[in-house]
């Protein structure tokens, strides 16, 4: 486990300048299953509009994203579910702690189709990922890691690997030999975001600090043509939740709630300023 040092890149002064250097990067967003649970399990009830029932159940997609870089090869953003969620429903390869939590909160994982898991998707499209960038260390984002080769390079925020994360992720990282920590405090500001890192130094992939849901949650921008895409992970729950100004959950108390609000404000400001950039979510098959 080591801290990743991003190469020095071009000194961009704003996102418009970044977008002017966009490259054609083939990419896909794909769903690996669903999480079925009440809205109040995933968001702050005090932020719900009157037409949203906190106890209403939704099936939330468990998304992963793939793109191909001209020199760094195939890259994933998050991993979704592996095949165990179809073979051993409803909790697949989740840790004991996650099974207890999901049982108490009446949450279930659904993968009714046996070929939508991460491994099946990669095999079907003949993809061997060289790199995986994680938005955060929650099990529904790391549960596909066992389907990947041990030498796959894995990246996530430096402050994520706390005891809680280890309990939630269980054995998802078992055997993985190349883990890199992203120190977002070294990143500069590109308004409206306070800390961003040009990960490859060529303007193609950016990590963006969006803490709150977890302490070092990250969003990622893929600078592709004709339209860049911003993957916000769980900093925003879904497209409709963002439109309703619903705030995601946090286990970090008042500090976490303040960070969730600040991160949501930055994402919503970015969307208002750059409406042509597609906003993608970890739990929605639709984008804004």
Predicted segments with their positions:
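Cap/insert and terminal regions of metallo-dependent hydrolase folds
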Residues: 83, 88, 98-124, 226-288
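Hydrophobic/aromatic beta-strand patches that form the interior of the parallel beta-sheet core
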Residues: 28-30, 75, 133, 155, ...
């Amino acid at each position: 486990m080591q801290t990743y040092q991003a190469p020095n890149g071009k000194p961009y002064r704003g996102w418009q300048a970044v977008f002017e250097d966009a490259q054609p990067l083939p990419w896909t967003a794909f769903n690996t299953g669903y999480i079925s649970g009440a809205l109040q399990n995933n968001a702050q009830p005090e932020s719900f509009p009157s037409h949203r029932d906190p106890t209403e159940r939704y099936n939330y997609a468990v998304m992963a994203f793939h793109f191909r870089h001209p020199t760094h090869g195939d890259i994933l953003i998050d991993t979704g579910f592996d095949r165990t969620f179809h073979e051993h429903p409803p909790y697949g390869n989740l840790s004991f702690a996650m099974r207890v939590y999901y049982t108490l909160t009446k949450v279930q994982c659904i993968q009714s189709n046996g070929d939508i898991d991460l491994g099946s998707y990669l095999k079907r499209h003949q993809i061997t990922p060289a790199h995986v960038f994680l938005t955060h260390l929650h099990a529904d984002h790391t549960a596909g890691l066992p389907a990947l080769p041990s030498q796959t390079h894995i990246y996530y925020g430096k402050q994520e690997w706390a005891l809680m994360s280890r309990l939630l992720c269980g054995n998802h990282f078992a055997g993985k030999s190349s883990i890199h920590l992203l120190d977002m405090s070294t990143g500069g500001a590109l308004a409206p975001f306070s800390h961003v890192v040009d990960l490859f130094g060529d303007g193609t992939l950016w990590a963006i600090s969006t803490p709150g849901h977890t302490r070092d949650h990250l969003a990622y921008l893929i600078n592709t043509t004709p339209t860049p895409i911003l993957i916000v992970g769980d900093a925003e729950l879904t497209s409709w939740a963002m439109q309703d100004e619903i705030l995601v959950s946090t286990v970090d108390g008042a500090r976490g709630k303040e960070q969730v609000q600040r991160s949501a404000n930055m994402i919503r400001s970015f969307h208002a300023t750059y409406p042509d950039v597609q906003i993608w979510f970890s739990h929605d098959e639709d984008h804004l």
